């Protein structure tokens, strides 16, 4: 596996450059346990970061030993202008940079209010009903096959007022919630991210949520159940290479086995592949 990953690394590096050169990237991260060689039996909690390109239906996985700000350096060091995330604090770094935009995810907001239904049914239901209206607009866009300015126009006319009304509702209602209750947490999660949640209405290519990157990261979750951990940090990096390239195949309906065989057989005959090769 390590030898194959080494041969595939030039392809993986090209994929990284595609991410760095992209305008709009979705981001998420998930734990990836790694065996600690200096402490037999101990596991280090590493992270796989997934940078997903909606334009190309392409995931790119990058292993980091932690979940700190260094995880987003690939994005910050490139030409990426817009990052969409679940609102995890490290992505806030993007908001501080000139000419950059950080979007958040309405699916995560909806999830918070679903969790709060048992705690405060009336208010949780109100929020969920309003969020459903936002998704109805997105379904209409898809059904009517709208493009470009037509998408922006519809979102600004229908979705944006709903977002702002939710903001005002949240501002009014939060004061009467019990601190740290599920409904209070849901409201606070939404209220502190309203600008990042509203931004998707202004560009047709932006998505209402981060669901594509979450779908692309699921195979890693399944892998954790089967493999449990990587044997070293180097092995975790190799896993990131395979997850990235096989994920690209899967997302673009390419047979991963055939693609892998074709590429590895081609690379066998090239001692030091150039960027073009």
Regions found by a protein language model. Name each.
Residues 4-19, 125-138, 246:
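Short, Φ-rich (hydrophobic/aromatic) sequence segments
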Residues 1-74, 78, 142-201, 205:
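Gly/Pro-rich turn-and-neighbor structural signature
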Residues 268-277:
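Single conserved hydrophobic/aromatic residue that forms the stacking wall/gate
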Residues 110-145:
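A conserved active-site cap/scaffold subdomain adjacent to cofactor or substrate pockets
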Residues 169-216, 220-226, 232-263:
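Helix-rich, typically C-terminal accessory recognition domains appended to large enzymatic cores
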Residues 3, 266-267:
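A short structural micro-motif
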Residues 95, 117, 201, 274:
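Short, flexible helix/strand-to-coil boundary loops that buttress conserved ligand/catalytic motifs
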Residues 10-13, 17-107, 111, 215-230, ...:
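Acidic, glycine-rich two-metal-ion catalytic cores of nucleic acid-processing enzymes
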């Amino acid at each position: 596996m390590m030898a194959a990953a080494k041969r595939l690394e030039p392809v993986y590096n090209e994929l990284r450059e595609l991410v760095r050169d992209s305008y709009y990237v979705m981001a998420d991260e998930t734990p990836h346990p790694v065996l600690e060689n200096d402490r037999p039996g101990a596991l280090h909690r590493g992270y796989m970061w997934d940078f997903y390109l909606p334009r190309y239906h392409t995931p790119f996985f990058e292993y980091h030993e932690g979940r700190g700000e260094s995880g987003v350096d690939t994005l910050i060091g490139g030409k990426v202008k817009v990052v969409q995330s679940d609102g995890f604090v490290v992505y806030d770094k993007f908001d501080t940079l000139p000419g950059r935009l950080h979007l958040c995810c309405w699916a995560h907001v909806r999830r918070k209010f679903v969790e709060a239904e048992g705690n405060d049914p009336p208010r949780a239901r109100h929020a969920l009903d309003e969020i459903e209206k936002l998704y109805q607009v997105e379904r209409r866009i898809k059904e009517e096959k709208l493009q470009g300015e037509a998408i922006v126009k519809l979102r600004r006319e229908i979705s944006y007022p709903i977002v702002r009304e939710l903001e005002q509702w949240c501002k009014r209602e939060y004061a009467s919630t019990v601190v740290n209750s599920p409904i209070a947490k849901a409201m606070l999660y939404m209220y502190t991210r309203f600008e990042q949640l509203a931004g998707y209405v202004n560009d047709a290519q932006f998505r209402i949520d981060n669901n594509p990157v979450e779908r692309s990261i699921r195979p890693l979750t399944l892998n954790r159940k089967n493999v449990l951990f990587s044997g070293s940090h180097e092995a975790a990096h190799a896993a990131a290479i395979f997850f990235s390239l096989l994920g690209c195949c899967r997302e673009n309906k390419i047979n991963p086995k055939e693609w892998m065989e074709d590429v590895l057989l081609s690379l066998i005959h090239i001692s030091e592949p150039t960027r073009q090769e």
